[in-house]
Design a protein with these regions (language model features):
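Hydrophobic alpha-helical hairpins/lids featuring a short glycine-rich hinge
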Residues: 68-138
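Hydrophobic core segments of alpha-helical transmembrane domains in multi-pass membrane transport
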Residues: 10-20, 35-47, 105-114, 183-191, ...
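Juxtamembrane inter-helical linkers in multi-pass membrane proteins
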Residues: 126-160, 226-247, 294-298, 326-327
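Transmembrane helical segments that form the transport core of multi-pass membrane transport proteins
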Residues: 253-344
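Alpha-helical membrane segments and immediately flanking helix-loop junctions
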Residues: 135-193, 320-408
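Long, contiguous bundles of hydrophobic transmembrane helices that form the permeation core
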Residues: 207-258
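Structural signature of hydrophobic alpha-helical transmembrane segments
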Residues: 1-11, 100, 292-294, 356-366
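Interfacial/capping segments of alpha-helical transmembrane domains
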Residues: 45-81, 227-230, 276-301, 314-322
Length: 416
């Protein structure tokens, strides 16, 4: 029954996308079908097949080992505030976001910058990009951008496509925006993992977002023009570093900007939510609903969607609330509020944990529209009106991609 509910959830999400399509007659069943199959296959390999699960677990273990080294830099700056005795001192509440999550982002961004400099990232992106281009029958630039989102965030995509921005047709531009919103960057992935989100789920979600973003981009805005972009040499940065030291330093400074942005936005929105909840609770108290909150309202509204995705009805309000927080605010705030349930074993069943983890894994939120419009407009001011028109539709496509990955994850966890 649960498995059939997951299948129903996939059908519901595809139906929503079809209804939102701007040109239903031009939908390519070849691309859409291949993207859906590939998204399911990646989920099955990493979540259900024993060899795939083994590889995912080993990679997750390696990521955790690498993350642990970030504590060395944190301890040098913050001393015992990142030590193991903090949990004992504060009775299990010694995890300090600013001392554990933000330094990890800086460390990993510097590490990724080094890997770009020595060519490792370029090789991976070219190999994966070629595979997805042929499998999905899409243009090279679409495949290139989609695969790059595994490592880079939506803020960096405009710099990647800048040399070709004038030759991108409307569909390619839309796909690039969708891919950025549907994914997460490698640096922020480490931040989510530090909050307790299973790394193997984050890895699987990142890979599934590649075909998922393309799937819903092509459903909502089918390709109607041929690609005009032709290139052999792909560049990942406008001014490549001249040494490995410069690469590390540049990456660290970029990581600092990301960490500062994360801290600022999280602090601001947590405060705003607290204010809104205070107002809602105060007004609700007049009518006997003193415990009403923004989370509870959003949870009730999205609970049916969470249920059809595979979440048990008893947890549907929580799942709906977290999905709503991710959409209205951002994924970091949603993961931050999800974290306490991950720290306490047995609070949620494995399937619910998987579905929520996948559903929140993406940059798709209303704030991202402003980020995308601002970032793309900076490199192509003359296309700003066009980009602004695509923003809301891209948000819908990216959100559906995240929810589809979550539904597929629930399907395979239910089979395990």
């Amino acid at each position: 029954m649960d498995v059939m509910r997951s299948v129903l959830g996939m059908v519901v999400l595809l139906t929503i996308a079809f209804l939102l399509s701007v040109n239903k007659k031009k939908i390519s069943l070849r691309t859409v079908g291949a993207a859906l199959v590939l998204q399911v296959v990646i989920g099955g390999i990493m979540l259900w097949l024993p060899p795939g699960r083994w590889v995912a677990e080993k990679v997750a273990f390696g990521v955790h080992k690498v993350m642990a080294y970030s504590d060395a830099g944190s301890a040098f700056i913050f001393g015992s505030l990142v030590g193991p005795k903090m949990d004992t001192l504060f009775d299990g509440a010694g995890f300090i976001f600013g001392f554990r999550v933000l330094p990890a982002i800086i460390f990993v961004t510097a590490l990724v910058s080094i890997l770009y400099y020595i060519g490792v990232m370029g090789i991976l992106i070219r190999i994966l990009g070629g595979i997805f281009q042929k499998a999905l029958n899409i243009s090279k630039i679409e495949s290139f951008v989609a695969v790059t989102t595994i490592f880079l965030g939506q803020n960096e995509i405009p710099a990647i496509v800048k040399p070709f921005i004038d030759r991108l047709n409307r569909n390619e531009l839309f796909t690039a925006i969708c891919s950025g919103m549907a994914s997460i960057a490698g640096s922020t992935m480490i931040g989510y993992a530090a909050l307790g989100v299973p790394v193997e789920y984050l890895l699987a979600a990142s890979l599934m977002a590649i075909p998922g973003g393309i799937l819903f981009a092509r459903l909502l805005s089918p390709a109607t023009e041929s690609s005009q972009v032709s290139f052999n040499n792909l560049s990942f940065t406008e001014t490549p570093p001249k040494s490995i030291i410069e690469a590390a330093a540049t990456g660290a400074m970029t990581g600092l900007k990301i960490a500062a942005g994360v801290a600022t936005v999280v602090m601001a929105f947590v405060t705003i939510i607290a204010l809104i909840n205070g107002i809602i609770g105060g007004v609700g108290g007049w009518f006997g609903f003193e415990h009403a909150s923004l989370e509870s309202i959003v949870g009730y509204l999205l609970a049916p969607l969470a249920w059809v995705m595979g979440v048990d009805w008893s947890d549907a309000n929580l799942a709906g609330s977290l999905i709503g927080q991710k959409l209205a605010i951002n994924e970091f705030v949603a993961y931050l509020n999800f974290s306490p349930y991950l720290q306490t074993a047995g609070t949620l069943d494995a399937k619910t944990v998987a579905i929520i983890s996948f559903a929140l894994c993406g940059f798709a939120n209303f704030g991202s529209i402003g980020v995308v419009v601002g970032a793309f407009s900076a490199v192509a001011p003359h296309r700003a009106p066009e980009i602004a028109q695509l923003g809301l539709r891209a948000l819908a496509a990216a959100t559906l991609s995240n929810l589809m990955s979550a539904t597929i994850a629930g399907f395979f966890i239910g089979l395990a």
